Regions:
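N-terminal hydrophobic/helix-forming segments and targeting peptides
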Residues: 1-166
Length: 166
């Protein structure tokens, strides 16, 4: 880059969907808010990781009221985020904060293990759009290094695409 030519920016987003601890309930479960685009009824019954104040990741399970405890009206109603919690095994707010080290504002991420099947030549994982976009920028920048171009190339791995670029 010499600063005298038009600039072409290669851009990909590096963030991914997740949650944030909004409150710690008296029974030790966590209320969460969404970071990015989620469909509420897809959230319960999944393993997640909650980062604590020590930087450790605590396993948890997203939960909602079981259908056998719901009224017929509740079963027909859309699931609201206020009715979704994360259970990390704490039995009180104090235990969640002191023993588990969880604070309001801590990130919560889905536990999705990357796998590759040689039989089908398929990968299973999360955030491929983010990771592949950033990898494509790096590979392109590497391939273009040292080439004479009539433009300057800039690579950017941006954030906040998942939350509406606020």
């Amino acid at each position: 880059n010499n600063g005298k030519r038009p600039v072409v920016q290669l851009d990909a987003h590096s963030d991914e969907v997740g949650f944030m601890v909004q409150a710690i309930c008296p029974n030790g479960t966590l209320r969460i808010i969404q970071l990015g685009g989620w469909v509420n009824h897809n959230i319960p019954a999944h393993k997640v990781w909650v980062r604590n104040r020590f930087g450790e990741y605590i396993p948890g399970i997203t939960a909602s009221k079981p259908p056998h405890f719901m009224t017929e009206q509740e079963r027909k109603a859309p699931l609201d985020m206020k009715d979704i919690t994360v259970d990390v095994g704490a039995v009180s707010k104090e235990e969640a904060m002191e023993k588990f080290g969880i604070r309001i504002g801590e990130p919560v991420v889905p536990d999705v293990t990357f796998t590759y099947s040689e039989t089908t030549d398929l990968m299973v994982g999360k955030s491929f759009d983010c990771r592949l976009g950033c990898a494509a920028i790096l590979k392109t920048m590497h391939n273009l290094a040292g080439q004479e171009l009539n433009v300057d190339i800039v690579g950017a791995c941006a954030a906040q695409e998942e939350v509406g670029v606020r």
